[in-house]
Amino acid sequence: MGRPLLLIAAGGTGGHMFPAQALAEAMVRRGWRVKLSTDARGARYAGGFPHVVEIEEVSSATFARGGPLAKALVPLRIAGGVASAVAGFLRDRPSVVVGFGGYPSIPALSAAVALRLPRMIHEQNGVLGRVNRLFAPRVQAVCCGTWPTDLPEGVEGYYTGNPVRAAVLERAAAPYIVPGDYPMSLVVIGGSQGARVLSDVVPEAIARLPEEILANLRIAHQAREEDVARVTEAYDRAGLLAEVKTFFTDIPRRLSEAQLVISRSGASSVADISIIGRPAILVPFAAATADHQTANARGLVEAEAAILIPESALDPGALSEHIAAVLSQPDAARQMARNALAHGRPDATERLVEVVEHLARKET
């Protein structure tokens, strides 16, 4: 009997592709063959996959882009992708098919349904994306990166967590130094593109803190390129020691050394914060599809590990009060850190592997 084949189907964004890559790496180590089914955009994110993973570009499309003619052709392009996937599966039958969301996962999952192959999906956010919502009732397992996750009626989810980078795992459960009368670190993360609203509000909010906190505070603030100069100037005017960059290559280290994190609540940011275990103030991106960033934050907020401030309610005064509350109460901050850690899933990849192998065993 040959080696089992895992077919991974994922859309063309980093949010879909990173957990797919983590699973691919783990399954290759366990002796499986792995194929990745994605579109041309997704293939650009596939450079980090193990070199033994075969990448198949599929015909897919989205209704979100293009003019009327392009939208009219979407069903035909998807149908062509499904037919191609069915033919490919008949030639080389996957043991399990895993979808990570995005329109490019439609052909492989549709083919798996048609051929009654073992199949599962992984959703990174607290609200199912359009494609995962479509397939949730049609797969044997729905793995959730964020918990709780809003699921269709009758569908049960399994909280695996979101796989994170090795650099984050190396800092998992790093000892938390509570706020005190010594140098403290505050980290501001705006997601992959920075966040203008955090650049607008955070510097002024910090400047309003009591002097006994400001005297010890060191700030690392991720901002958009066009905002770096004005944010730096705002901190300088307030006499604050701040490092402002568009991207920090050592975010895991900075998180592990932080007394408090102010962040958007993208799925990967929430996973990093919970696995390292740090108190957080979360400001969900208001324009996120289906308000999924608010859903992402819900688990940490309900665990009393994070404070949620809707973007519409974010102002310097309110934010300053929340920052001061965390940094002036060391026992409460320590408990928030513990609660975050308890909510995390550092073994997310291993949990996904277990589900894949369980489905494969059921088939044999």
Swiss-Prot record:
Similarity-based family: Belongs to the glycosyltransferase 28 family. MurG subfamily.
The protein's Enzyme Commission number: 2.4.1.227
Intracellular or extracellular location(s): Cell inner membrane
GO molecular function, one term: undecaprenyldiphospho-muramoylpentapeptide beta-N-acetylglucosaminyltransferase activity
Annotated positions binding UDP-N-acetyl-alpha-D-glucosamine: T13, G14, G15, N125, R165, S192, Q293
Pfam families: Glyco_tran_28_C (PF04101), Glyco_transf_28 (PF03033)
This protein's record includes keyword Cell cycle: yes
Protein name from the UniProt record: UDP-N-acetylglucosamine--N-acetylmuramyl-(pentapeptide) pyrophosphoryl-undecaprenol N-acetylglucosamine transferase
Organism domain of life: Bacteria
Keyword Membrane: yes
Membrane topology designation: Peripheral membrane protein
Enzyme kind, highest EC tier: transferase
Cited function: Cell wall formation. Catalyzes the transfer of a GlcNAc subunit on undecaprenyl-pyrophosphoryl-MurNAc-pentapeptide (lipid intermediate I) to form undecaprenyl-pyrophosphoryl-MurNAc-(pentapeptide)GlcNAc (lipid intermediate II).
Keyword vocabulary terms for this entry: Cell cycle, Cell division, Cell inner membrane, Cell membrane, Cell shape, Cell wall biogenesis/degradation, Glycosyltransferase, Membrane, Peptidoglycan synthesis, Transferase
